[in-house]
Amino acid sequence: MTRVVATGTFDILHPGHVLYLSEAGKLGDELYVIVARDSTIKHKRKPLVPENQRLFMVRALKCVDHAMLGSEDDMFKPIREIDPDIITIGFNQHWDEEALQRQLIERGLKAKVVRITKCDTAPYASSRHIREKIKESDC
């Protein structure tokens, strides 16, 4: 059985997230999703949607078999617990595949890192784009 892990913030869940998770799920038999904790998100602005609500929405997706919040202390802790065969990263996630692969190997983890490519068929496939559209609207 091939276990696949996908990670992300999933703030303002949108079609791009669903496509990313769906493509990740096709790589194996079980898809585990690790949702970033509010307290660990440092590379962008604070999420609009609280972590428990983001987790609830990710769990509701048909393509997701298991979903959990990440660790506040050690980002590799849930990875060690799941022991996946594949770890996916999205086209716009800041990870360098080779550097992440090295970090996994250093920790005795054998998962292969796979970047999921961008899907241009979804018009609102970016949380940033959605925020910009909201700002432009008369709401």
Swiss-Prot record:
Full protein name: FAD synthase
Cross-referenced NCBIfam families: cyt_tran_rel (TIGR00125)
HAMAP family per record: FAD_synth_arch (MF_02115)
Record-listed ATP binding positions: 9-10, 14-17, 92
EC number: 2.7.7.2
Cofactor dependence: a divalent metal cation
Family under the similarity heading: Belongs to the archaeal FAD synthase family.
Family annotation (Gene3D superfamilies): HUPs (3.40.50.620)
GO biological processes: FAD biosynthetic process; FMN metabolic process
Organism: Methanocella paludicola (strain DSM 17711 / JCM 13418 / NBRC 101707 / SANAE)
Reaction equations catalysed: FMN + ATP + H(+) = FAD + diphosphate
Major enzyme class: transferase
Record-level Gene Ontology MF annotations: ATP binding; FMN adenylyltransferase activity
UniProt keyword list: ATP-binding, FAD, Flavoprotein, FMN, Nucleotide-binding, Nucleotidyltransferase, Transferase
Pfam family, one: CTP_transf_like
Keyword rRNA-binding included in the entry's annotation: no
Annotated function: Catalyzes the transfer of the AMP portion of ATP to flavin mononucleotide (FMN) to produce flavin adenine dinucleotide (FAD) coenzyme.
